[in-house]
């Protein structure tokens, strides 16, 4: 009986905890992003509207079409791809939000290897 009480208590505590995801707050705006790949941190700033995103990184500008699947998932398609990698669409999923940032995971569409990053809303 004692084990049952402990088990039920744990289920109630962990069952009530849910990761905050107010994804619609991050559909549009200006953002700063950091992604770590192979221990190298890549930084960029980007402005996203309902249907387009313009990103600046390493002195380059990249533009993509934006297609929201739901409030927390989006597909990016590069407007003028310069190579085979840029021709692949990217799937991004917001996995957690705070009042000023969101944590995300992303991969090429159909790829199982995912990367994670964080974006901070600037406006």
Feature locations, PLM:
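Tryptophan-anchored aromatic micro-motifs
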Residues: 23-39
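N-terminal glycine/threonine-rich, aromatic-flanked beta-hairpin/loop signature
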Residues: 41-69
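An anionic, turn-rich surface loop/hairpin at beta-sheet edges
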Residues: 76-99
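Short, exposed beta-strand-loop hairpins at the edges of beta-sheets
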Residues: 55, 94, 103-115
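A short, structured loop/turn motif at beta-sheet edges
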Residues: 65-73, 94-101, 121-123
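Bacterial signal peptide processing site
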Residues: 17-19
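Positively charged n-region of N-terminal signal peptides that target proteins for export
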Residues: 1-4
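C-terminal motif of bacterial Sec signal peptides marking the signal peptidase cleavage site
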Residues: 12-15
């Amino acid at each position: 009986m004692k084990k049952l009480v402990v088990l039920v208590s744990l289920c109630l505590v962990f069952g009530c905890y849910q990761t905050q995801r107010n994804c619609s707050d991050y559909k549009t705006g200006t953002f700063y992003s950091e992604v770590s790949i192979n221990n190298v941190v890549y930084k960029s700033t980007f402005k996203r509207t309902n249907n387009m995103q313009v990103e600046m990184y390493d002195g380059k500008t990249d533009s993509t079409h934006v297609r929201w699947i739901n409030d927390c998932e989006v597909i990016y398609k590069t407007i003028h791809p310069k190579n085979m990698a840029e021709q692949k669409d990217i799937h991004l999923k917001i996995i957690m939000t705070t009042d000023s940032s969101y944590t995300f995971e992303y991969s090429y569409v159909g790829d199982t290897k995912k990367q994670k990053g964080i974006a901070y809303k600037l406006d």
